[in-house]
Design a protein with these regions (language model features):
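Positively charged n-region of N-terminal signal peptides that target proteins for export
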Residues: 1-4
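Extended repeat-based scaffolds of very large eukaryotic assembly and lipid-transport proteins
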Residues: 20-260
Length: 260
């Protein structure tokens, strides 16, 4: 009996440590993603993206933090907060010095959705048009229109950030049960939103993060016909990416992604 209790105690202790192991890595990834060191942030982003839906609650929580943590060691990275431009390098259309926008960047890359975070850095004369196109429910309200007309460009940027965060939170409130990245990829390719289509196509071509269930068989059965259709559209960014996927008959784009 004594031996039984000892074994039971050790099993419980082991379960506690296993549970701690599962929680601790994500918290460490979150901490790294909030870092000011760009290589650390980029590495954490990829690892968090590999966890799929498991990181989304943390990303939504990060959107409550809109402080600026200016990135360092960015090299030739091209993004709105960059202080030097080298004429080449990775391009990111998000002001990722801003923590809540950084969370939105990862969430949009993970889900292939367009919540609006990339519109914050647009030229002053494009901000109102972006609001009308991406947040029509807000824009078409007369009192909101009056308020919008009184805003400076800085105020419009703050408004876009606020509306993007609200859109992301509302989406997750309704989508959290049963969401998975594979279905999201399929939906984005079928979307009428060019940005969603391009994100999904770019992921297929160049993405190195996990999408559970994405296999050659799944592609041929569910995605290939969509890609062929997108290759014929007039939007250059969409058709060019789709054509390049079709040309990759060896499925090299699939081999660079983690295996399930």
């Amino acid at each position: 009996m004594k031996r039984y209790h000892v074994c039971l105690f050790l099993c419980c202790l082991s379960a506690i440590f296993i549970s701690a192991d599962k929680v601790e890595p994500m918290q460490q990834l979150v901490n790294d993603f909030l870092s000011a060191d760009w290589p650390t942030v980029l590495s954490a982003k990829e690892k968090m993206e590999n966890t799929g839906e498991d990181c989304i609650d943390d990303l939504i929580n990060m959107m409550n933090d809109c402080r600026v943590n200016k990135l360092q060691n960015t090299g030739d990275l091209i993004f709105p907060g960059a202080e030097k431009y080298f004429g080449h390098g990775q391009i990111i259309d998000y002001d990722i010095d801003d923590i809540c926008v950084r969370a939105g960047w990862l969430l949009e890359d993970l889900t292939f959705l367009n919540f609006g975070f990339s519109g914050i850095h647009l030229p002053d004369n494009e901000l109102e048009g972006f609001i009308s196109g991406n947040f029509p429910e807000y824009f078409n309200n007369p009192s909101n229109r009056t308020h919008l007309e009184e805003l400076t460009a800085s105020g419009e940027r703050t408004l876009i950030r606020k509306l993007s965060i609200e859109k992301a939170k509302n989406w997750w409130n309704s989508a959290s049960q049963g969401w998975n990245r594979l279905d999201a990829l399929h939906e984005a390719l079928n979307s009428q939103d060019e940005k969603c289509q391009v994100k999904a196509l770019f992921y297929l071509r160049n993405g190195r993060t996990r999408c559970e269930g994405l296999t050659e068989k799944y592609y041929r059965t569910h995605l290939e016909s969509i890609i062929k259709k997108l290759a014929k559209v007039k939007l250059g960014r969409v058709s060019e990416n789709a054509k390049l996927i079709m040309l990759d008959s060896d499925f090299d784009w699939l081999s660079i992604k983690p295996v399930d």
